[in-house]
Amino acid sequence: MNIDLHAHTNQSDGLLAPQQLIDLAMENGVDMLSITDHDTISAYALINKLPRSLKLIPGIEISCSWNNRTIHVLGLDIDISNQIFIKTIKDVVDQRLKRGEKISKALEKLGIKNSLDGALKYADQNLGRPHFAQYLVELSLIHI
């Protein structure tokens, strides 16, 4: 049995849309998959077609503070309809946006304009550092 319990989509810092990830998992013989995007469960609402042969385990990777450090905790087999959980995730996403505003101000001091808007083009709802990196690639300021 092939299992992947830690996969990201473009709803956080992955490159593939949720349905593309599921299709790729099927092409590669994955039997059980958990989409564990950073601080969001939005990928699950974007899945159009789930093959019967693929068991999808609802998951998330949540950013937490512990001993003055940020750590990531995987949650598996979560209830994606729990309203308290959804509210908590929204609060974390709001914090990520505030962090993004700080990153944007720092980039502005370096002469890079409109970085918040640029990063948000790649972020959908859940802004993170990789989205700023994608914008810097777009501007040809960094190369991968």
Say what each PLM segment does.
Residues 1-69:
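An N-terminally biased module of ancient metal coordination in phosphate/nucleic-acid-related enzymes
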Residues 46, 102-109, 134-139:
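Histidine/acidic residue-rich metal-binding segments in metalloenzymes
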Residues 46-52, 61-94:
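Active-site phosphate-binding/coordination module
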Residues 79, 90-101, 123-126:
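Short, amphipathic alpha-helical segments
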Residues 94-119:
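Conserved phosphoryl-transfer catalytic core
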Residues 121, 127-135:
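Glycine-rich, often acidic, oxyanion-interacting loops/wings at catalytic, nucleic-acid
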Residues 142-144:
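Conserved small/polar residues in nucleotide/adenosyl-binding loops
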